[in-house]
Design a protein with these regions (language model features):
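Short, conserved sequence motifs used for protein processing/export or organelle targeting and
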Residues: 83-109, 115-235
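Bacterial N-terminal signal peptides
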Residues: 5-14
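Active-site-proximal cofactor/substrate-binding loop regions of enzyme domains
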Residues: 18-106
């Protein structure tokens, strides 16, 4: 899971379409990944999403931390089908519990740097870590394709050499409003930011340096921007 989580640092890269190729280098520190698992069919979720939305104005956005809003599909049967829900996002949340990095599968549910985080429920702010990365990521954007190169740092080689790396690239939606006409949030206008609308992932085995090409297709829901993207109830 450490390897999978590490590669989420690709999320700091912009995937907008440029006329000329653009090269983007990962920073010299790990970027914190804050995942929210939510659903438009969950009456307890809007406050958590409102808080996540407020991070748009936080200092360090994209350089210190990256929020991602994953809508799960396991509440789609209770009166409202979430248009942003994906079975792959539900599977991703269940994987955290299966690997014992989270205690349960619930909405709203937070994962911070690969582990369950309940601080929001107690009015706490996340504690961003400031650590050296295991390697450098170089992304070259050319039209709708992206070439990703990873070079491990000396201190990162030991635990990376024996396994596979997964590259995760998500397209996030912003300034999205949905009028809900059924389910627990019936009659409410829900606002969303950092919404994971598409998640690409590829797995590669690595010897010393990785270079791979990925095709990223634009998917527009509301005003979108390109950045990097299981049934218990907590409500």
């Amino acid at each position: 899971m450490k390897l999978v989580f590490f590669t989420l640092l690709i999320s700091v890269f912009s995937l907008s379409v440029y006329a000329e190729p653009r090269v983007i280098q990962s920073p010299d520190h790990k970027v914190n990944i804050l995942e929210l698992y939510t659903s438009q069919g969950c009456s307890s979720c809007p406050p958590a999403e409102q808080w996540l939305n407020s991070l748009k104005t936080e200092e360090g956005l994209w350089t210190t931390f990256v929020p991602i809003n994953f809508h799960v599909d396991y509440w789609d049967y209770i009166g409202w089908k979430d248009p942003f829900a994906s079975a792959s996002f539900s599977k991703r949340q269940r994987l955290y519990k299966h690997l014992k990095f989270a205690r349960n599968v619930a909405t709203p549910g937070f994962i911070l740097n690969g582990k369950g985080w309940n601080g929001w429920f107690y009015g706490q702010s996340p504690s961003w870590v400031n650590e050296s990365p295991s390697g450098d990521i170089l992304a070259t954007l050319n039209g709708q394709s992206i070439e990703v190169a990873f070079t491990p740092k000396p201190q990162g080689r030991e635990h990376l050499q024996s396994g596979a790396l997964k590259v995760h690239i998500a397209i996030l939606g912003f300034d999205i409003t949905t009028k809900v006409t059924g389910g627990e949030n019936e009659g409410r206008d829900l606002s969303h930011d950092f919404v994971g609308s598409t998640l690409f992932q590829r797995e590669y085995y690595f010897i010393n340096r990785i270079i791979n090409r990925l095709l990223c297709q634009r998917k527009q829901k509301g005003k979108t921007e390109k950045k990097s993207r299981e049934k218990d109830r907590q409500s």
